[in-house]
Amino acid sequence: MALLKSRLLVGVARCQPCLAAVQGRASSWWSHVEMGPPDPILGVTEAFKRDTNSKKMNLGVGAYRDDNGKPYVLSSVRKAEAQLASKNLDKEYLPIGGLAEFARASAQLALGENCDAIQSGRFITVQTISGTGSLRVGANFLQRFYKYSRDVYLPKPSWGNHTPIFRDAGLEVKGYRYYDPKTCGFDFTGALDDISKIPEQSIILFHACAHNPTGVDPKQEQWKELAALIKSRRLFPFFDMAYQGFASGDTNRDAWAVRHFIQEGINVVLSQSYAKNMGLYGERVGAFTVVCSDAEEAKRVESQLKILIRPMYSNPPLNGARIAAAILTQPDLRKEWLQEVKGMANRIISMREQLVSNLKKEGSIHNWQHISDQIGMFCFTGLRPEQVERLIKEFSIYMTKDGRISVAGVTSANNGYLAHAIHQVTK
């Protein structure tokens, strides 16, 4: 009996550290952390995956698909990859500012090779971690060095990530009217009215082309008026250009607004992404450009951008930048890429036109002209949340509650089904 009691006491003693560990875990450092809300777009994808309907459609995710609904890798990208693989290149770190030939080629693509800022060297472009990284580098740079205002005005609505990017960088996010739900088009009058009241020297963000999420872009004459107003109000423009070439199929046309502002003597900052127009989603290829007053100022800005980037991510990824640089700088690859970009843009334009035509064939009495008037990957359909809910439940057509669809997810095979479903929930 004494031996059994002794063994029990030893066993209890051995368990004391375990009990202490359990108690320690119970009083975790992170017990106060609440569950964050799910990403609305990723939530759409998860629901789509669970659906067993053979006709289901995922119109939530902003990634291009071919007319068979499959991911599309550009031929120019494949050729650039093969070319790079044959060179047996190293995998050394890039400089903080990224691959120099990529950065310069990106600036030339956006601003135009004959742009005065390019010719005089009064710009600096750094490679970034796609468009999101570019926006964050830009936001941090403005937070630290733009001494005139802490307010950044975004179009209403804007890409969902814009607000947290600028807010988390320490800037105050505000808005100006942009989309008119009555016309499903650009609220030009409202935009001019709001912008005219923005305090001078505030920061204002524009989507250079293919506005996300509405697909609504100003016309060139409207851009001219906006530029004149920005200049007279002494506002600071931040352009986000994630879809150059992907909107109209013409890289020069899609960059028109940015180039016009610079021609008018307005120095801008610019974010670029190659996720959509080169299909380099997972490679995370982007650029951030600051147009300066002179070359000496550009050098000072470059030095501070490097200081910002170093503790953020040290240096950007190598492989995607090499691919993009090869495409942008080699005439044969560039020519093929421009044709492929135009092909992707044209497929999306065609899907828009077919959808409008199919809705008419269904007998819809509503005006769906805005679907073909809008541009780029996304379309604001004008559908109400309860109509979207019916599309999901009755037809397995998935989209965000605001009625935004990714036209890239529409194909020749399912266009008619989509039109039929939309007609059923709107008639």
From Swiss-Prot:
It is an enzyme of class 2 (transferase). Its EC number is 2.6.1.1, 2.6.1.7. Keywords: Aminotransferase, Mitochondrion, Pyridoxal phosphate, Transferase, Transit peptide. GO terms for cellular component: mitochondrial matrix; mitochondrion. InterPro entries: Aminotransferase_I/II_large, Asp_trans, NHTrfase_class1_PyrdxlP-BS, PyrdxlP-dep_Trfase, PyrdxlP-dep_Trfase_major, PyrdxlP-dep_Trfase_small. It is found in: Mitochondrion matrix. Substrate binds at G62, W159, N212, R404. Residues 1-26 form a transit peptide. GO terms for molecular function: kynurenine-oxoglutarate transaminase activity; L-aspartate:2-oxoglutarate aminotransferase activity; pyridoxal phosphate binding. It catalyses: L-aspartate + 2-oxoglutarate = oxaloacetate + L-glutamate; L-kynurenine + 2-oxoglutarate = kynurenate + L-glutamate + H2O. GO terms for biological process: 2-oxoglutarate metabolic process; aspartate metabolic process; biosynthetic process; glutamate metabolic process. Its cofactor is pyridoxal 5'-phosphate. The modification N6-(pyridoxal phosphate)lysine is found at K276. Catalyzes the irreversible transamination of the L-tryptophan metabolite L-kynurenine to form kynurenic acid (KA). As a member of the malate-aspartate shuttle, it has a key role in the intracellular NAD(H) redox balance. Is important for metabolite exchange between mitochondria and cytosol, and for amino acid metabolism. Homodimer. Belongs to the class-I pyridoxal-phosphate-dependent aminotransferase family. This is Aspartate aminotransferase, mitochondrial. It comes from Xenopus tropicalis. The gene is got2.
